[in-house]
């Protein structure tokens, strides 16, 4: 299954979710590829300790802009490979908008189709905005998981990204489906409780039962350039992401 993990805005736990879902699947013995198309490259920086030494030719930039095969790197997590991102991806909207005759929305899909048989699951870490990179990710995917953190503006952004999903389904990828809404950074505050209540009232069965708690172990893991399972497999976040993978992939 190819799953895009997306959010309309930053700071929702999207990248943490991408890394954690990929790592949780790998821990279950599955062969996993994480494709980072977020120009901030945070997934890449966590999973590849030597990321800063990579040139753009060793990243997904060469596929999206150069129309060349994916450059796949092994990580220190057994069973988990990554296609890293690059800061220059932040300029892709201008370049891809000028290439419409080339069907720019399919650039990632074309190359993913060539390697998909080598993996049980492919996770795409999308940028925190609606762009040509998001369109490429959704066009290549079977499912989209939308990450939502507590807050009024976070809930408001769901409408936009849901509309994008429907537009991609209508125009580029008729098989695309919503995997569900994942509530992250949950805590005991009123804002968090109200946000979750509104999310469940509005989207009912489309909201995952699993809730991801706010957990300092996640930031500590990132500083150590480790996924949450390699850093603290007994943490609340690790337990939650393990439950999410079981729920989502029925493992």
Region spans (language model):
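P-loop NTP-binding core
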Residues: 1-251
